[in-house]
UniProtKB/Swiss-Prot annotation:
Documented EC number(s): 2.7.1.100
GO molecular function: ATP binding; S-methyl-5-thioribose kinase activity
Gene: mtnK
Protein name: Methylthioribose kinase
Pathways involved: Amino-acid biosynthesis; L-methionine biosynthesis via salvage pathway; S-methyl-5-thio-alpha-D-ribose 1-phosphate from S-methyl-5'-thioadenosine (hydrolase route): step 2/2
Family: Belongs to the methylthioribose kinase family.
Subunit structure: Homodimer.
Species of the source: Yersinia enterocolitica serotype O:8 / biotype 1B (strain NCTC 13174 / 8081)
Alphabetized SUPFAM superfamilies for the sequence: Protein kinase-like (PK-like)
GO terms (BP aspect): L-methionine salvage from methylthioadenosine
Length: 399
């Protein structure tokens, strides 16, 4: 008989006392359920003084925003914990610290990050963290290189691909990124004023052909252990610090997907800034986002290449020039997946505050149309955008 049961606040406190690695566990007395996502319960465990000391996260057996009509495997909690532990092995400074996890209860205890802020919220408020893009690039380079064929033995990699097979969560990504936005589906969510743009996307055969190629690569390219959902809402930042959280979508997939999703979320903020700030602040913020995406790719690519030169285990993959050739394909994948993120976050199920929090209706629609137009451009032109400078030029041309 399964030990699984949905935690109450009292259950979360007791669990944190046992597994929170707190010197004075009985000091933990209350729990606040703070989960704002679709898949989990998240409790902040506080002491008598009201200070948050540790986080308890439990997977629910269904999609929270839909209900029990959309069931989900609880094994995703194991995959999330093990993904974070693996990523933490290679990049501890930028991965949330997992203190304990229990696969049967689908629960994880992790460090409290109350001294950090969610990066998306800070971007929407116009607060700039100049080191964040480079730190995210370091996280991506370290975690993706060390779980790839460049570093892992073929036997270890194949075993890991099996261990991290995550079909139900991948199905969500496959549907929300590559299928739903291009068909009439009940999960789609968009302003009726955008219907002409939505219909144009559905009828764009060249776009749908390019999206089919992106989906096929997502389905078939087990290049590294991805975070799988690395957007600005799954990243905590503080001055000089950054940590990735929420890795339940982890699986072995195309490296460009994680990189492209990260780039796409910076560009969602770029598209939303005219509606989030006055003209001068919006213009300055947009230049910051372009600087961020430049730093993100340049730092990631240089770091990944350096790791390949230093640590590649396979003698064939160590052939001079191969890592750079491989990285060029990662880049083109990333540009395409970046475009997919722009489109699906605008008209699909899961939106972002960078666009949806814009108060003025007409300005919000203009920013959403920009995101759709830019997303389409990037998907269609990915194979012809050869460098980060080319990408930035395309972004400027698009508005």
């Amino acid at each position: 008989m399964s030990r699984y049961h949905t935690f109450t606040a009292a259950d979360a406190v007791e669990y944190a006392r046992q597994f929170g690695q707190i010197a004075d566990p009985l000091a933990l007395v209350t729990a606040d359920e703070i989960g704002d996502g679709n898949l989990n319960l998240v409790f902040k465990i506080r002491d008598a003084a009201g200070m948050s000391r540790v986080i308890v996260k439990q997977a629910l057996p269904y999609v929270r925003c839909v209900g029990e009509s959309w069931p989900l495997t609880l094994d995703r909690a194991r995959i999330e914990a093990e993904t974070l532990l693996t990523h933490g092995q290679f990049c501890p400074q930028h991965t949330v610290n997992v203190l304990h996890h229990d696969a049967e209860l689908a629960v994880m205890v992790q460090e409290d990050l109350s001294d950090h802020e969610i990066w998306r919220s800070e971007l929407v408020k116009g607060k700039y963290y100049p080191q964040a893009a480079g730190q995210l690039a370091e996280y991506l380079a370290q975690t993706l290189f060390h779980t790839s064929d460049f570093y892992q033995s073929a036997q270890a990699k194949k075993a890991a691909v099996s261990r991290y097979t995550n079909p139900e969560l991948c199905q969500i990504t496959e549907d929300l990124f590559f299928t739903d936005p291009y068909i009439d589906h009940e999960r789609n969510n968009f302003d009726p004023a955008l219907l002409p743009e939505v219909l144009a996307l559905r009828q764009d055969d060249a776009l749908k052909l390019a999206v089919a190629s992106l989906k096929h690569r997502f389905l078939s390219k087990a290049e590294a252990l991805l975070h799988g959902d690395i957007h600005s809402g799954s990243i905590f930042v503080a001055d000089g610090r950054l940590k990735a959280i929420d890795a339940e979508f982890g699986f072995y997939g195309p490296i460009g997907f994680d990189v492209g999703t990260a780039l796409g979320n910076l560009l969602l903020n770029y598209c939303g800034l005219p509606g989030l700030a006055g003209p001068r602040d919006a213009a300055a913020g947009r230049e910051q986002r372009l600087k961020d995406i430049h730093i993100l790719w340049e730092t990631f690519s240089h770091r990944f290449l350096a790791l390949c030169e230093e640590k590649t285990q396979d003698s064939t993959l160590a052939t001079a020039g191969y890592a750079r050739l491989f990285l060029q394909q990662v880049w083109q994948d990333a540009v395409g997946y970046c475009g997919s993120e722009l489109i699906r976050r605008t008209i699909g199920l899961a939106h972002v505050a960078d666009l949806d929090s814009i108060a003025d209706d007409e300005m919000r629609r203009a920013c959403q149309r920009h995101a759709l137009s830019l997303g389409r451009t990037l998907i269609l032109a990915a194979s012809r955008i050869d460098s980060i400078d080319d990408l930035i030029a395309r972004i400027r041309q698009n508005g």
